[in-house]
From Swiss-Prot:
Predominant subcellular localization, coarse grouping: cytoplasm
Top-level taxon of origin: Bacteria
Record GO terms (molecular function): 16S rRNA (adenine(1518)-N(6)/adenine(1519)-N(6))-dimethyltransferase activity; RNA binding
Protein name in UniProt: Ribosomal RNA small subunit methyltransferase A
Documented EC number(s): 2.1.1.182
Binding locations of S-adenosyl-L-methionine: N27, L29, G54, E75, D101, N122
InterPro entries linked: KsgA/Erm, rRNA_Ade_diMease-like_C, rRNA_Ade_Mease_Trfase_CS, rRNA_Ade_methylase_Trfase_N, rRNA_adenine_dimethylase, SAM-dependent_MTases_sf
Free-text function comment from the UniProt entry: Specifically dimethylates two adjacent adenosines (A1518 and A1519) in the loop of a conserved hairpin near the 3'-end of 16S rRNA in the 30S particle. May play a critical role in biogenesis of 30S subunits.
Alphabetically ordered keywords of this record: Cytoplasm, Methyltransferase, RNA-binding, rRNA processing, S-adenosyl-L-methionine, Transferase
Subcellular location per the Swiss-Prot or TrEMBL entry: Cytoplasm
The keyword rRNA processing is annotated on this UniProt entry: yes
Length: 276
């Protein structure tokens, strides 16, 4: 079934009264060329499983299905479920709809066997960063997914790919750099969305590292949270609440440095120093 055989998205939204909700961080994409570009960025999707979070009325969903994917769409806005069901009827057996909150979803249970899914989503802005953190810190590793192609606000995208000694470098950049290889694929202007956000958006493509530096995710999460929670302070101060003095001494890292100057490898060393 061709994507062109489905009714236009604007018609679907009017028929189901699907005005985007600010409380859910919704910004809908209508441009079929753009949704197809996002789907292509995820690679060859023919007969491949894909997880989509926050599909809304299904603009990106249509593009993923048109590229041959088997899509599992997770949507917490009940208003959108009927519109998604109409798409599912056009693609029998290729669209599974889960009504619920992605933050509460056990993703590892969705695909107990077969190839690992790719995550492709225009993430709701109000939960996108937390979802990414959950996926970066998931255990066991390698993770349940094979890649992620995600839309974020440009500022968040820059934090994901940031390197030490840069303005955007922080906890997100350390965790992403530790376990994955991430790149900004392309930018999306505000006018591509309804309603248009006030900022530029970017699509980020993320591929897990098979063998990241050995480290406990929980410990690295704790270290980075403390270090960047007071990022303007010296490490001996920002890490004080978690025994930073001993950690710095054990690793030989200068306590007068600030968090944004440390490499991913140095953060891993601090996390490993937490071990008894």
């Amino acid at each position: 079934m061709s994507i062109d055989s489905l009714p236009p998205l604007r018609e679907v939204i009017e028929r189901h009264d699907l005005m985007p909700k600010k409380s859910l961080g919704q910004n809908f994409l209508f441009d079929l060329n753009l949704t197809s570009k996002i789907a292509r960025q995820a690679g060859d999707l023919r007969d491949q499983p894909v997880i989509e979070v926050g599909p809304g009325p299904g603009g990106l969903t249509r593009a993923l299905l048109a590229q041959g994917a088997y899509v599992t769409a997770i949507e917490r806005d009940d208003r959108c479920l009927e519109a998604l069901a109409e798409i599912a009827a056009h693609y029998p057996g290729r669209l599974r709809i889960i009504a619920g909150d992605a933050l509460e979803q056990d993703f590892t249970a969705l695909f107990p066997e077969g190839p690992k899914p790719r995550i492709v989503a225009n993430l709701p802005y109000n939960v996108g960063t937390q979802l990414l953190l959950n996926w970066l810190l998931v255990e066991p590793w390698p993770p349940f997914y094979s890649s992620m192609t995600l839309m974020f606000q440009r500022e968040v995208a820059e934090r994901i790919v940031a390197k030490p000694d840069s303005d955007h470098y922080g906890r997100l950049g350390v965790l992403a750099g530790w376990r994955t290889q991430a790149k900004i694929a392309f930018d999306v202007p505000p006018q591509a969305f309804t309603p248009p956000p006030k900022v530029m958006s970017s699509v980020v493509h993320i591929v897990p590292r098979e063998t990241p530096l050995p480290c406990r995710a929980e410990a690295l999460g704790q270290i980075t949270q403390a270090a960047f929670g007071q990022r303007r302070k010296m490490l001996r101060q920002s890490l004080k609440s978690i025994g930073g003095g001993a950690l710095l001494e054990k690793t030989g890292i200068d306590g007068t440095r600030r968090a944004e100057t440390l490499s991913v490898e140095e953060f891993v060393a601090l996390a490993n120093a937490c071990l008894p």
